[in-house]
């Protein structure tokens, strides 16, 4: 009786793998255990078929008297007919055991690990030895070599340049210069606007030394102030003449003491506030601060603002409320 391969079910099995629990022929054994390093470490036992001269059959493992006919996979024992019926008819669990007929084929006493051939011997598939020591099965037919894939070129194509300019463009058409990139992403702006520090930003420039502090413009002396007042009598403005050099942002300064009184002219008709410096000789003394409401009563016809060098915050009068509601001040 012969045992067929559990994989192809055509050829006669030559080895038994304990990890796969399957009988394999020579060709299937090479395909299964040559797949990876883990499969190559499986222990295999060669199948020893009985010879024609030796017809003695093994004895039962239970009674040790009669010839064994069956092999129980769960009990891992060979049983005779009587022992098999008494053991597997005991309950429902033993009835489900898998039993096989004995063919007289024995396993080798020693196991072997699959040893892949070297590179030199792999070139000639006809010289490969797939046999297991102690097996009488001849070498299987050689396997066909798989077709190799065509080699792929890893060359990088050089960048192409535009004939009409100096900007280099790659094969997908994207620009490589920073100026063209900024012109595409920020339309209306040029690279010179970001790089040229001499251009003023939004009409403001930095004057004087590069110390980050704006210059403070002092008023001129009394003689220069009188001379300027004589030239500007029609305008009634006491302004400070600023030098042409190192011209920066001029911030009006608040005097130490408030003027004693304000003139009758506070606001101009166009409601523009004029800034200047306070002069003791030309400006009257102010004792108390007059609110905005008194200013409106003093000059109704021709209102003009006379700058004394300080800031005056106008008071906002809330709209009149209805008669049934009380007036509430928010200030």
Curated annotation (Swiss-Prot):
Residues 115-126, 228-238 have a biased composition (Low complexity). Keywords: Activator, Metal-binding, Nucleus, Repeat, Transcription, Transcription regulation, Zinc, Zinc-finger. SUPFAM superfamilies: B-box zinc-binding domain. Disruption phenotype: Enhanced number of emerged lateral roots. Disulfide bonds: none annotated. Residues 115-167, 209-241 are annotated as: Disordered. GO terms for molecular function: DNA-binding transcription factor activity; transcription cis-regulatory region binding; zinc ion binding. GO terms for cellular component: nucleus. Its main location: nucleus. A zinc finger (B box-type) spans 5-47, 60-102. It is found in: Nucleus. Zn(2+) 1 binds at residues 5, 8, 28, 34. One of its GO terms (biological process) is photoprotection. Zn(2+) 2 binds at residues 60, 63, 83, 93. Signal peptide: none annotated. Pfam families: zf-B_box (PF00643). Interacts with COP1, HY5 and BBX32. Interacts with FLZ1. Transcription activator that acts as a positive regulator of seedling photomorphogenesis. Acts downstream of COP1 and play an important role in early and long-term adjustment of the shade avoidance syndrome (SAS) responses in natural environments. This is B-box zinc finger protein 21.
């Amino acid at each position: 009786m012969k045992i067929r391969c559990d994989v192809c079910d055509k050829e006669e099995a030559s080895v038994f793998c304990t990890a796969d629990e399957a009988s394999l022929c020579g060709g299937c054994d090479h395909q299964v255990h040559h797949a990876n390093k883990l499969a190559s470490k499986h222990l295999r036992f060669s199948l020893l078929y009985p010879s024609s001269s030796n017809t003695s059959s093994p004895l039962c493992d239970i009674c040790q008297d009669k010839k064994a006919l069956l092999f129980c996979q769960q009990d891992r024992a060979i049983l005779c007919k009587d022992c098999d019926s008494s053991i597997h008819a005991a309950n429902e669990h033993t009835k489900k055991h898998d039993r096989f007929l004995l063919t007289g084929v024995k396993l080798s006493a020693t196991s072997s690990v699959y040893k892949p051939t070297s590179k030199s011997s792999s070139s000639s598939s006809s010289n490969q030895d797939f046999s297991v020591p102690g097996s009488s099965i001849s070498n299987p037919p050689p396997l066909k070599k798989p077709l190799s894939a065509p080699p792929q070129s890893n060359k990088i194509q050089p960048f192409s340049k535009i004939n009409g300019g100096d900007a280099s463009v790659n094969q997908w058409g994207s620009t490589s210069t920073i100026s063209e990139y900024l012109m595409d992403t920020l339309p209306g702006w040029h690279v010179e606007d970001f790089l040229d520090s001499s251009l003023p930003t939004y009409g403001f420039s930095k004057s004087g030394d590069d110390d980050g502090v704006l210059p403070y413009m002092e008023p001129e002396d009394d003689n220069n102030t009188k001379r300027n007042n004589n030239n500007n009598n029609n305008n009634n403005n006491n302004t400070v003449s600023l030098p042409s050099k190192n011209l920066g942002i001029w911030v009006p300064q608040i005097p130490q003491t408030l003027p004693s009184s304000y003139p009758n002219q506070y606001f101009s008709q166009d409601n523009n506030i004029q800034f200047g410096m306070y002069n003791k000789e030309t400006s009257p003394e102010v004792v108390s601060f007059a609110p905005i409401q008194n200013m409106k009563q003093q000059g109704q016809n021709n209102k003009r603002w006379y700058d004394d060098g300080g800031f005056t915050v106008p008071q906002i009068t809330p709209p009149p409320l209805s008669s049934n509601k009380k007036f509430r001040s928010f200030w």
